[in-house]
Design a protein with these regions (language model features):
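Zinc-dependent deaminase catalytic domain
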Residues: 1-156
Length: 156
């Protein structure tokens, strides 16, 4: 297995995706579990996150099961990676972001670009997955922004 432009081999890409998958299990969301992890240029874990409510916000079963209430409060895994890194004084510039669950949405893509993440890796999934179809338009906008800003993305 060769290395990509970030210097990470596909073997390690798959390992980091497995770690993002494990992190996704920490989410309390009953319908969608997303996990994400940022890896530095030397293979070090910089930050991790999963989809959930902000710290201190009550994540009751009622709120989690009501789509409108949940979406008004939930922080996406990718943004939690960014917020957690920022809270700990860690830069994500030049890092690779691994996402398990759904492709990066356009809102999260803005954050990815702004903090200098250079590569986004996601697992291949079934294209007819209902949750994935719901986010397809947003992912298409994210891809366009990634292309324009020089962020590489791939499904493995």
């Amino acid at each position: 297995m060769g290395r990509n432009v970030s210097g990470i081999s596909q073997k390690w890409d798959l390992r980091y995706l497995e770690l993002a998958k494990h992190i996704s299990t920490w989410s309390k969301d009953p319908s969608t579990k997303i996990g994400s992890i940022a890896i530095g240029k030397n293979g070090q874990v910089l930050s991790q996150g999963y989809n959930g409510f902000p710290r201190g916000v009550i994540d009751s079963t009622e709120r989690l099961n009501d789509r409108e209430k949940k979406l008004a409060r939930v922080v996406h895994a990718e943004m939690n990676v960014i917020y957690n890194a920022s809270a700990n004084g860690v830069t994500l510039k030049g890092s690779t972001l691994y996402i398990h669950g759904l492709p990066c949405c356009s809102d999260c893509a803005k954050g990815v670009i702004q903090v200098g993440i250079k590569r986004v890796v996601m697992p291949k999934k079934e294209l007819n997955d209902p949750a994935r179809l719901r986010w397809e338009e947003s992912w298409n906008k994210a891809k366009e922004m990634f292309r324009e800003s020089g962020v590489q993305w791939e499904f493995i």
